[in-house]
Amino acid sequence: MSQGSDFAARIYAAINARDRAAIKALTAPDIVVKTTVEAYRGPEALIEWMDEGDDAFEDFTVDLLEVEELAGHVVVSMRQRGRGKASGAEVANHLIHVWALRDGRGISLQSFSDREDAVRHARRSAGG
């Protein structure tokens, strides 16, 4: 398993398990997390994102669909699923996460709703 695939498996397993210690261990102290809506900074950023999902949804989980290493980044196609606490409606949305790693830890995470935008971001961030 490649470093990127291993990292993706471990970080999303930690998110699904709500394992705060593992999330902190897998991310750098200066990680920058940019969702499609807002930005967060620091390891608590992923935990805040996870908690926001738990506040809005029952059974909030993330399913990995595809992991690819591209231009020095880890590009993860994933699906978030849950059931709305207020409405009871099943919700699933498809996102692409682009991770940058340093020494095996996440230093940045950018969310995209479109794969081509994610690929462009990875290539541009790598200077290509």
Language-model segments: what does each one mean?
Residues 1-26, 69, 123-128:
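Short, low-complexity N-terminal intrinsically disordered segments enriched in polar/charged residues
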Residues 59-62, 91-96:
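Short, surface-exposed coil-to-beta transition loops
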Residues 20-24, 28-72:
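A solvent-exposed, acidic/Ser-Thr-rich amphipathic alpha-helical stretch
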Residues 71-80:
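A short hydrophobic beta-strand element
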Residues 34, 77, 109-110:
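Beta-strand residues in well-ordered beta-sheet regions across diverse protein folds
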Residues 80-82, 101:
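Hydrophobic beta-strand positions in extracellular immunoglobulin-like domains
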Residues 82-90:
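Short, cysteine-centered beta-strand-loop-beta hairpins and adjacent loop/turn segments enriched
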Residues 96-120:
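Short beta-strand edge/turn micro-motifs at domain boundaries
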